[in-house]
Structures are given as C-alpha cells and as structure tokens.
Amino acid sequence: MTDQEAIIQLYREENEAMVAKNLSKLNQILAPTMKLTHMTGYVQPKLEWIDQIQNDEMQYLSSKEENIKDIEIYDNQASLIGQNQVQAKIWGGGVNTWPLQMKMYFAKQNGNWIITNQVASTY
C-alpha cells in the first residue's frame, strides 16, 4: 500500500468508526495528542471526543464520502481534505446533515500512519 492509499484508508476508517461507535478503532488510529477543531472553533482533545461519542453527546448517524482532495505527503507528514455529507446529532441538537469538510493531518510513526490533527468546516 502506498502512503497515499494508507492516509485515504485512515480517513475512511475514521468516518466508519464514528458512525459505528467503534471506539477502539478510533483510539487506535488517532494519535494520543490528536486535537479536533470543530466548526465552532472549539478545540477538542482526542479522549474527550471519544468519550462524547461513547455517551451519545455526539451521535454520527451516517457519513457519505463525496470528495478527497489536496493530498500532500512530505516524508513522515501528510495531509488531505475530505468532504462528506454527515448526518449527526451534536450536543443535544436535532438530527442534521452537514457538508462536513475535514482537513486531516497525519504522521508516520514506526512505519504506520496515524491521524494527528483535524480541522472541521463546511463546504
């Protein structure tokens, strides 16, 4: 598998794990220091995000991939932009579908890629 294929696979695995509430998969593919910057600007640490998925404060109901673009790989660092239609209930709100754009950052550690940072916006 090429580096490009590996980071695309990680992006897709994260989206699948969010919907399936596969917390062990999220823990495995996210760096311990991973931060998720939400559309509101709130910067959320990895374990808080996973906890909110576990407790249904953030319920991801579906995620439909529309585009992956701007893939950049430099040695052991990489990034991409993924665009998905995400249906979710967030922090007590109703069910909504967002055109969610994620700027994803990756690092290669011990020969394996891991997600290090994410920034959410809409497209």
Regions of interest found by a model, annotated:
Residues D3-K21, I29:
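Short, aromatic-enriched amphipathic alpha-helices that serve as compact interaction elements
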Residues Q4, L23-I73, Q83, N96-T97:
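A solvent-exposed, acidic/Ser-Thr-rich amphipathic alpha-helical stretch
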Residues E14, E65-I71, V86, Q101-A107:
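Hydrophobic/aromatic beta-strand elements that line small-molecule binding cavities or substrate pockets
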